[in-house]
Swiss-Prot record:
Ranges of biased composition (kind: Polar residues): 253-271, 317-327
Protein name: G protein pathway suppressor 2
Processing and modification events after translation: Sumoylation regulates its subcellular location. Sumoylation at Lys-45 and Lys-71 regulates the shuttling between the cytoplasm and the nucleus. Sumoylation at Lys-71 is required for interaction with TBL1X. Sumoylated at Lys-45 and Lys-71 in mitochondrion. Desumoylation by SENP1 leads to relocation from the mitochondria to the nucleus. Ubiquitinated at the C-terminus by SIAH2; leading to its degradation by the proteasome. Interaction with TBL1X and methylation at Arg-323 protect GPS2 against ubiquitination and degradation.
Modified residues (Omega-N-methylarginine): R323
Length: 327
């Protein structure tokens, strides 16, 4: 049977120490609980304070809010008014600046125009003085300028044409023009009908002026200078005998045909027959000098002459090779 062990009896000191220890532990636990309770109470108080504050914020009246809105609106209106005043001031400054700039520009334009007029007056006076020159040659530059202006306006050379002479006196002394259409027994000193030119023969008035560069291709008789002065200028009728004797007509006609076959100078259309009087004129008709006849024919024929005429050939005789130039 097991033996029973008896607990030894505690001494008084040990019993008091154990009692103290237990009491301290209890006290410590109670303090901890109290601290926890205090913390919980503090938290609850803080929570209540937050709730109260929130409730107070929620309890704020609508009038206070309206008052705040009115204050903000007044502040905004003041800012807008200040902005408007600044804008008006800026506009005024810009307008004044524009007026000042226009005034300066107008003053500058006035000064520039005045200076330009003054310089133009001085330049014109200097130019007139340089043009006048010395007193001895005062009128000469103006005359030369007028002459140059006239040359520029009217060309270097002006040709004056006139109607073709209707009288046979213009061709007096030239044996080639002795066979005009008229009475068989008419003399050269009497008036005869004008020679019959081509259907497209141009007629010009005495007052009409033709410039030299453009006159030559326009008139069909103003061509290049021909080597002969006695060219036939129209259609003539070879049926009139004139001053030839009947015995020599046949031989002269044969010579003329032979010459027409040999020559290489012909018109664009056909060779016009020439009267035998042009080859073998009467001895009485050759009494007048040929030089005045040429001058008279050139002056009265109505054809415009150039400043440099072509070479003049003497009258063709029977001994020379007969070549005829027809217009």
């Amino acid at each position: 049977m097991p033996a029973l062990l008896e607990r030894p009896k505690l001494s008084n000191a040990m019993a008091r120490a154990l009692h103290r220890h237990i009491m301290m532990e209890r006290e410590r636990k109670r303090q901890e609980e109290e601290e926890v309770d205090k913390m919980m109470e503090q938290k609850m108080k803080e929570e209540q304070e937050r709730r109260k504050k929130k409730e107070m914020e929620e309890r704020m009246s609508l009038e206070e809010t309206k008052e705040q809105i009115l204050k903000l609106q007044e502040k905004l209106s003041a800012l807008q008014e200040e902005k408007h005043q600044l804008f008006l001031q800026l506009k005024k400054v810009l307008h004044e600046e524009e007026k000042r700039r226009r005034k300066e520009q107008s003053d500058l334009t006035t000064l520039t125009s005045a200076a330009y007029q003054q310089s133009l007056t001085v330049h014109t006076g200097t130019h007139l003085l340089s043009m006048q020159g010395s007193p001895g040659g005062h009128n000469r530059p103006g005359t030369l300028m007028a002459a140059d202006r006239a040359k520029q306006m009217f060309g270097p050379q002006v040709l004056t044409t006139r109607h073709y002479v209707g009288s046979a006196a213009a061709f007096a002394g030239t044996p080639e023009h002795g066979q005009f259409q008229g009475s068989p027994g008419g003399a050269y000193g009497t008036a005869q009908p004008p020679p019959h030119y081509g259907p497209t023969q141009p007629a010009y008035s005495p007052s009409q002026q033709l410039r030299a560069p453009s006159a030559f291709p326009a008139v069909q008789y103003l061509s290049q200078p021909q080597p002969q002065p006695y060219a036939v200028h129209g259609h003539f009728q070879p049926t009139q005998t004139g001053f030839l004797q009947p015995g020599s007509t046949l031989s002269l006609q044969k010579q003329m045909e032979h010459a027409n076959q040999q020559t290489s100078f012909s018109d664009s259309s056909s060779l016009r027959p020439m009267h035998p009087q042009a080859l073998h004129p009467a001895p009485g008709l050759l009494a007048s000098p040929q030089l005045p006849v040429q001058i008279q024919a050139a002056g009265k024929s109505g054809f415009a002459t150039t400043s440099q005429p072509g070479p003049r050939l003497p009258f063709i005789q029977h001994s020379q090779n007969p070549r005829f130039y027809h217009k």
